[in-house]
């Protein structure tokens, strides 16, 4: 566990430095060579499915890269990741969550015997999360006989009062549990085919699972069986599919 936590701290420090250098570089290029800046941002967007998402144009999101809002949100994400406690082979954190009906429960209450539990963390304002919702729903359809699924709604990735994107869901950052529940109900309208719960306003689940802005896990018998890389680039339902296929 010590080495895992040390790696977390080193990774966060490296990512923070990367964010600062990237932002400075992009802002210089936007002045000296706008076309090159655009190419670099589009390349980064391709890795997180922004360029593949027909809902968004470059102007909706690309111009925000390197902004103060970009730096602030990315830095906050790295800071929250320092509190993670979910590691492969270790006990799964039984963090508290709230159902969309307002009932308080916890993540491990959704574990059933030896059946795997797939956790999908995200929010409506996270375009890669919503873009891959169809892929996630297909996972549910294909493996409902093998595993259970749970969506955990966390703080907004791109709230209208934060690092906002054009043509995105118009949701402000949650100020209360009711705000978060209201946002989660918008996701429920998209029928994720599994239960949806929300993180507490302390963001305890997002912290313990390092799940901001999005992340995938597979739990089994109280342990972490699979831990996807941090989103948006690491949110890969195909990796979960590979894990579940081995359990048939």
Curated annotation (Swiss-Prot):
UniProt cross-references to SUPFAM superfamilies, sorted A to Z: Thioredoxin-like
Function noted in UniProt: Responsible for the deiodination of T4 (3,5,3',5'-tetraiodothyronine) into T3 (3,5,3'-triiodothyronine) and of T3 into T2 (3,3'-diiodothyronine).
Family of this protein: Belongs to the iodothyronine deiodinase family.
Record's keyword terms, sorted: Endoplasmic reticulum, Membrane, Oxidoreductase, Selenocysteine, Thyroid hormones biosynthesis, Transmembrane, Transmembrane helix
Keyword Cell membrane: no
Location in or out of the cell: Endoplasmic reticulum membrane
Main location, first listed in the record: endoplasmic reticulum
EC number: 1.21.99.4
Membrane topology type: Single-pass membrane protein
GO biological process assignments: hormone biosynthetic process; thyroid hormone metabolic process
Protein name listed in UniProt: Type I iodothyronine deiodinase
InterPro entries: Iodothyronine_deiodinase, Iodothyronine_deiodinase_AS, Iodothyronine_deiodinase_I/III, Thioredoxin-like_sf
One GO MF term: thyroxine 5'-deiodinase activity
Active site: 126
């Amino acid at each position: 566990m010590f080495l895992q936590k040390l790696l977390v701290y080193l990774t966060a420090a490296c990512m923070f430095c990367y964010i600062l250098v990237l932002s400075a570089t992009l802002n210089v290029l936007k002045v000296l060579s706008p076309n090159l800046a655009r190419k670099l941002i589009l390349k980064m967007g391709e890795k997180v499915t922004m360029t593949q998402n027909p809902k968004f144009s470059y102007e909706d999101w690309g111009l925000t890269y390197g902004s103060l809002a970009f730096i602030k949100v990315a830095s906050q994400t790295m800071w929250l990741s320092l509190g993670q406690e979910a590691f492969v082979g270790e006990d799964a954190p039984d963090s508290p969550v709230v159902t969309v009906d307002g009932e308080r429960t916890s993540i491990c209450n959704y574990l059933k015997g030896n059946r795997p539990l797939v956790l999908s963390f995200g929010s409506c304002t996270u375009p890669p999360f919503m873009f891959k919702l169809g892929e996630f729903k297909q996972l549910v359809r294909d493996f409902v006989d093998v595993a259970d699924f749970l969506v955990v709604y966390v703080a907004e990735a791109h709230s209208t009062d934060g690092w906002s994107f054009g043509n995105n869901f118009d949701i402000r950052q949650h100020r209360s549990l009711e705000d978060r529940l209201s946002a989660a109900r918008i996701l429920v309208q998209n029928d994720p085919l599994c239960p949806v719960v929300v993180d507490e306003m302390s963001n305890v689940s997002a912290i313990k699972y390092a799940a901001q802005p999005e992340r995938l896990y597979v739990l089994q018998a109280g342990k972490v069986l699979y831990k996807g890389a941090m989103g948006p680039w690491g949110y890969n339902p195909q990796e979960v599919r590979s894990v579940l296929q081995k359990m048939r």
